[in-house]
Curated annotation (Swiss-Prot):
Organism of this sequence: Arabidopsis thaliana (Mouse-ear cress)
Induction: Slightly induced by dark. Triggered by pathogens such as Pseudomonas syringae pv. Tomato DC3000.
Keyword field: Cytoplasm
Signal peptide positions on this chain: none
Pfam families per UniProt: Senescence_reg
Biased composition annotated in UniProt, kind: Basic and acidic residues: 20-44
InterPro entries xrefs: Senescence_reg_S40
A GO BP annotation: response to absence of light
Location within or outside the cell: Cytoplasm
Entry protein name: Protein S40-1
GO cellular component: a single term: cytoplasm
Top-level lineage group: Eukaryota
Region of interest (Disordered), ranges: 16-58
Amino acid sequence: MSEEFDESEIIFSDNYFPIRRREDGNEKENNRPVDFRENSERVWNKSSRRSKTTPLPSAVTAFSSSLPVNIPMRRYSTEEEYSDDDGGRKMIPPHLIVGRRMEGGQMAFSVCTGNGRTLKGRDLSRVRNSVLKLTGFLEA
């Protein structure tokens, strides 16, 4: 690479680089972007020769080829499409569900074996076996 660029020149550039066409037939150099510094030097050299009242020549305007084309209008929908159909049931908050299960003895504490204890040895293998049985990987 003969010339180094700053990151701001590449990523945050305010200019579009038009494609330079050459007549020599070299395909790699045919579609090479025009360098920003070359453009600015050409404009600066031309403008330095002219008087300050003469306007600068307008740069070749190029537009992005990735602009979206023929975007359909968004179809606005009614609330009926987004409504949740819960069958008329009333929602019960999760903390009430947990409280009811703890009172009735239905709450499962498969990994909670005590305060501050970690699962080791026989306790760990029991938990592992119960999980494998519940998931169907181990038959009872």
